[in-house]
Regions:
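Glycine-rich short-loop/terminal segments
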Residues: 9, 13-105, 183-185, 189-235
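Short HxH-centered metal-ligating active-site micro-motif
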Residues: 83-138, 144-147
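Compact, glycine/acidic-enriched structural inserts
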Residues: 154-178
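Sec/Tat signal peptide C-region and signal peptidase I cleavage site
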Residues: 3-8
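Generic domain-boundary/flexible-linker signal
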Residues: 31-32, 120, 151
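Short acidic-glycine loop/turn motifs at beta-strand connectors
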Residues: 78-84, 144-148, 152-157
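Generic marker of residues within folded, mature protein domains
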Residues: 67, 130-132, 154
Length: 235
């Protein structure tokens, strides 16, 4: 039996991009340490999430840079003046549960999306997005090796429409990845490709599905009343 664990972090319920301009990475992303992440398509970056206050951003970014290289998820929350909402919370390799107090009205909630070499940390899972929609915190972030994903509500936020949109996007994500993984598994079992090529192909397929999901989230901003971006890392 072939099994490679490419769990979508936050998928079990993470409670609930650095740089200014946009730009994109096409086909691969080269990290500051020289390692490469391969995918099909275009990973699109945006500007800074303007919803965050200067005070909140200073505290949030310092915490994200401190924790982004950890191998398990951590969560943290601050108010608009930069005051922390309780202590950070340590999770596991695929999720982190944080207290409801983290989701206070106007708060910014952030957590870490770690993943292994050759893999994108990835955008928000359906669980992340459901928590964002159902709680009063204004902004939710996920810091990954490729940057910081950030989503904020506007005064036109459509909770139910957004949740339906996210559900459809994640169904497409799952079906797209699973179809490619099944094809690769068939090729491996038949001897058409070796195990190393199978692993590399699965990683690329997963990254590709994550890029597609990210770009889909970006496309729904105006219709459902939210701001979404991937901020480039400055370090």
């Amino acid at each position: 039996m072939i099994k490679i664990n490419l769990q979508f972090f936050g998928g079990r319920g993470a409670s609930s991009s650095g740089g200014g301009g946009g730009g994109s990475a096409k086909g691969e992303l080269v990290l500051p340490n020289g390692s490469k992440i391969e995918f099909e398509g275009e990973l699109k970056y945006g500007g800074k999430d303007a919803t965050l206050t200067k005070e909140a951003r200073k505290v949030i970014e310092a915490w994200e840079e401190k924790r982004v290289k950890n191998k398990v998820e951590y969560a943290y929350s601050v108010m608009e003046d930069g005051t922390p909402v309780g202590a950070e919370v340590r999770g596991g390799t695929g999720s982190v549960r944080s207290p409801r107090s983290y989701k206070q009205d106007g708060a910014t909630f952030t957590h870490i999306h770690p993943r292994g070499d050759g893999m994108l940390g990835g955008t928000f899972s359906k669980a992340d997005m459901d928590n964002f929609a159902n709680n009063p915190a204004k902004t939710t972030r996920a810091k990954a090796k490729e940057g910081a994903y950030s989503i904020s509500k506007t005064d036109k936020f459509d909770t139910q429409g957004f949740k339906s949109f996210v559900s459809g996007a994640n169904s497409k994500f799952n079906s797209s990845y699973k179809a490619k993984e099944k094809s690769l598994a068939t090729d491996y079992k038949s001897g058409k490709i070796g195990y190393d090529d199978y692993k590399k192909g699965v990683a690329k397929a997963f990254n590709t599905a994550l890029v597609e999901l990210h770009n889909t989230y970006s496309s729904g901003q105006k219709q459902y009343g939210y701001k979404y971006t991937l901020e480039k890392s400055e370090k």
